[in-house]
Amino acid sequence: MSRVCQVTGKRPQVGNNVSHAHNKTRRRFLPNLHNHRFWVESENRFVRLRVSTKGMRIIDKHGIDKVLADLRAKGEKV
């Protein structure tokens, strides 16, 4: 399972750990992803999505129906 938000498309980024002495070592910044079930009233069923917390806020703002319509328009199976 890839670490990509289905709503926002957020994925891991690469950067550095920087110590007090400014030694740099490579690291990954992972998105805050959650497997979450959303109730879809229009379809009378739950939909399971892998979303970041920002994606959850977008769903709260625009509604699950609009977000699902956008996902289906992109060709994603939900």
Swiss-Prot record:
One of its GO terms (molecular function) is structural constituent of ribosome. SUPFAM superfamilies: L28p-like. Coiled coil: none annotated. The keyword Ribonucleoprotein applies. One of its GO terms (biological process) is translation. GO terms for cellular component: cytosolic large ribosomal subunit. PANTHER family: 39S RIBOSOMAL PROTEIN L28, MITOCHONDRIAL, LARGE RIBOSOMAL SUBUNIT PROTEIN BL28M. HAMAP family: Ribosomal_bL28. This is Large ribosomal subunit protein bL28. The lineage of its organism: Bacteria, Pseudomonadati, Pseudomonadota, Gammaproteobacteria, Moraxellales.
